[in-house]
Amino acid sequence: MKRITIIAGHYGSGKSEISVNLALNKKIDYIVDLDIINPYFRSRALNEVFEENNIKLIESTIEGMLNSDMPYVSGAAAVPFVQDHISAIYDLGGTENGGRVLIQFVDRIKKIEDIDMLYVVNIFRPETADKDKIIKAIQKLEGESQLRVTGLINNTNLMHLTTEEEVLLGEQVLDEVSKELNIPIVYTVVEETHDFEHQFKGERIKLSRLVARKWL
């Protein structure tokens, strides 16, 4: 995993759960919430999890109206970009303009070599249900953020009802995207309660639903 990892995906893709799980599993220093609309990381219980694991949370701070064409977040979000001893996961907003918040950091980001921007896909979400929709969403994100997506995360699921075949179906769709855009599948997400035997593409993330649980 790179020192800086930006996790992107459409609303409801599961990117926030993945961000938390990766931060815990990979012992990341910072998790940066760049979602200025939906405060998924702000529950007290989830913050306790971060504190127990020595993960610093940087939350979004709106400096202007929510509907601004160029929303800005706290300057603290830039700290991992300029201090190369800090590892961080950036969780982008899943709204239509979620990638725009990165523009204020783009000059710093482009100087970093040890960085990935990963796109999370659940093909059972209508916005990313097939190859063409996924490619369109990725290209839109790249246009907004002025950055390139470097990897794909297969998070195809129907929560606890998910079957191995459904995860494989998501992999098949993402294989098509991967070949067309030349972007590898770097992670496949499987809930920790499932014991699927298939060797999926990329590294397997055994997902614990911490965000959904702590949000309640």
Can you describe what each PLM-predicted range is?
Residues 23-69:
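N-terminal phosphate/diphosphate-binding loop that engages ATP/GTP or pyrophosphate donors
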